[in-house]
Amino acid sequence: MSIFSSLSSLSTGSLKSSVSSIENGSSSGSFGSNETSGWGQHHWNSCRPCPPPRPICRPCPPPCHPKPRCHY
């Protein structure tokens, strides 16, 4: 369980940097391709809890911050 906690912390850090890149528009070209369609801009804008079959959840960036969101 401690391994999962440390992974969550690492993921949160990298997620925040990814979010700031999206907000700045500097990496918008890398999103929306077939490989990363699950991480597209529309996905960041919709903050919703993870459905049961999707165990990999991560914190939302502001303004929806404490709600988790899924990546597919």
From Swiss-Prot:
Skewed-composition ranges (Low complexity): 1-38
Region (Disordered): 1-43
Protein name per the record: Putative uncharacterized protein DDB_G0285443
Organism: Dictyostelium discoideum (Social amoeba)
